[in-house]
């Protein structure tokens, strides 16, 4: 019986739901992975130093990214998810600007741009999903 309910759940998902979960999953994996690297990788520490940031900043940023992942994946209030999206946007735009400012190669400039594109898909589909949920709740 449980297998049937799982099948019904997947059958009820729309393309918008799939786009949301795939983009949010990718974004979350990227953020959790980068946070791990911020905590453990000497190369990342050197990169932050090259960008002119103090050593403690990468630890703070790693913690913030992990909190953002929790806010996106856990059943949290809407305002927390909105703040997580906003924080990630600030992080990606700042990373892009910092890499361009120090003359880093395109291989260092491109990842925040790709992450921002994935975030936009996640955010747009999140807003559409919540709007649809509110509309169906009002009809009921």
Show the residue positions of the predicted features.
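Membrane-interface extramembranous regions
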Residues: 2-140
């Amino acid at each position: 019986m449980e297998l049937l309910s799982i099948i019904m759940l997947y059958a009820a998902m729309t393309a918008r739901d799939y786009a949301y979960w795939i983009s949010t999953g990718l974004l979350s994996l990227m953020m959790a992975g980068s946070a791990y690297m911020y905590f453990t990788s000497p190369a990342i520490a050197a990169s932050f130093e090259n960008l002119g940031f103090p050593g403690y900043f990468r630890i703070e940023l790693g913690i913030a990214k992990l909190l953002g992942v929790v806010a996106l994946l856990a059943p949290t209030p809407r305002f927390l998810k909105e703040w997580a999206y906003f924080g990630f946007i600030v992080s990606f735009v700042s990373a892009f600007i910092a890499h361009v400012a120090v003359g880093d190669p395109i291989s260092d400039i491109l990842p925040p741009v790709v992450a921002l594109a994935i975030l936009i898909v996640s955010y747009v589909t999140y807003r559409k999903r919540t709007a649809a949920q509110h509309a169906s709740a009002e009809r009921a």
